[in-house]
Amino acid sequence: MEQKESMSRRDALKTMGVIVATAALSSTGLSVFAAPAKKDKNKKRLIFYFTATGNSLYVARELAGESGQLLSIPRLIKDEHLDFEADEIGFVFPDYAASAPLMVREFVSKAHFKAQYIFSVITFGNFAANVADWCDDFCKEKGLQNHYINTLLMVDNYLPVFDMNEQVKIDKKIPDNLAAIVDDIHGHKQFIAHFEQMDERMQGFLKRLQENHFPMEAERLLRLNTETCIACGTCAAVCPHGNFRMTDTHAEFSGSCEYCLACVHACPQKALTLERERNPQARFRNENVSLRDIKEANHQK
């Protein structure tokens, strides 16, 4: 025989309160039974980067967050033992003719990487072209599988084509786009930013540029005004190849050049220039990065 128990008014109100609270929390996506998921801070994340005027360093810092480790490719390239293992490994570098700087290519070719999640973020200033596809193919040739490759539009520091004073005025929505990339990577999103359409002539031009343009000779590219140079050593400190040396009165340079223009942008006297520039008086450095940061990233001691 069933025995029916009557519910007191107090118990009924208590039960109703639990139901209402549960419904309210559910509408916000939270649960009364489980805490929201948190990012695992115990995961080891390595970020390898190449920077000239700070764009890629800024991005690398944002991707590293509080617990990631930043590693400068120019400071590592000469090491004999380049074996790296982590939960997550990332690469951040600028787009050079729809490819990576030569030093980045050399580093990836000679190093060994092991990680559960590998990603690349490529900064560019005007036209990314098929750089993500190039990165995917290049890394696969080296036995490296990217799970995520994306591009980020930023200030273009290429002085022969762009006026830096005009470039910095353009709203390229960098914070919003970068935040979206950071979220993608935290969530281990699988994505390659494929470029579907490109003129065959453009493809051929970029391929010839990649194969024949780099490395360059510093002597052919740079112009030095010895009258305004004060031998301060800034160019020597920011050059990823270590191509500069100081005399008592001025700088001297020679050797293979990445054409990153770090030296030209950083010179406090504007003594270093190129043969052709849109605005010889305008220079650029990412506002979130100091000159000291770039020196620490690139100086060849």
What spans do the regions from the language model cover?
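Iron-sulfur cluster-binding cysteine motifs and their immediate structural context
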Residues: 32, 37, 224, 230-258, ...
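C-terminal segment of N-terminal export signals and the immediately downstream linker at the start
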Residues: 28-52, 58-66
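Short gly/ser/thr-rich secondary-structure transition/capping motifs
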Residues: 69-76, 247
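Ferredoxin-type iron-sulfur electron-transfer modules and their immediate structural context
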Residues: 132, 148-230, 278-301
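N-terminal export signals
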Residues: 11-34
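N-terminal secretory signal peptides
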Residues: 1-7, 35
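Helix-loop-strand module that forms the ligand-binding subsite of alpha/beta enzymes
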Residues: 74-154
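Short, flexible loop segments at the rims of nucleotide/cofactor-binding pockets, characterized by
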Residues: 67-71, 94-98, 243
